Regions:
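Alpha-helix initiation/capping motif
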Residues: 30, 51, 107-110
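Amphipathic beta-strand/beta-sheet edge segments enriched in Tyr/Trp
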Residues: 58-141
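A structural "domain/chain start" motif
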Residues: 1-36, 131-143
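Short acidic low-complexity segments
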Residues: 47-58
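Solvent-exposed loop and beta-edge segments used for protein-protein assembly and interaction
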Residues: 12-14, 54-56, 70-72
Length: 143
């Protein structure tokens, strides 16, 4: 299977807008800060950040979980992926993803180390999205 065929899973009807589902637990980086950073990255790439997801469409999923070791160090787990989100009863959410569309890290360190890993993983997933949905040479959506 070639790369183009596998990337069809992450293609969107309207690739110029994307929802980012962001979940942060007990970390030195807040949901609000991470959301602002991700939305700024999207806007720089001319992608409109959506405030609501359309179930069944590709979204950028970011989950960052931390446990404080002391006042300046955390153990962290980061998962960033292109995923299809499906809302179930109440607040339940099902997340479908493919392994090759997942980026992330496990580690222990300060806020700066966590931020570096978040930036790297978000950039990797976002580039995969752009490559699947746009012809990056002329800057137009794929036909």
């Amino acid at each position: 299977m070639n790369a183009l065929a596998t990337d069809r899973w992450i293609e969107k009807r309207d690739p110029e807008e994307l929802y980012a589902y962001i979940d942060v637990f007990a970390c030195p980086i807040s949901v609000a800060d991470l959301t602002a950073e991700v939305h700024a990255t999207m806007i720089r790439s001319r992608i409109k950040p959506l405030t609501e997801w359309n179930p069944g469409e590709i979204a950028l999923y970011i989950a960052l979980d931390c446990a404080a070791e002391d006042e300046s160090h955390w153990v962290f787990e980061l998962n960033v992926m292109l995923a299809k989100l499906r809302k179930e009863r109440g607040d339940d959410v099902i997340i479908s993803f493919r392994h090759e569309d997942q980026f992330g890290a496990f580690g222990k360190g300060g806020r700066e180390l966590i931020q570096q890993n978040v930036d790297k993983a978000v950039e990797g997933a976002f580039m995969k999205y752009l490559e699947a949905n746009f012809d990056l040479a002329p800057g137009e959506p794929k036909p």
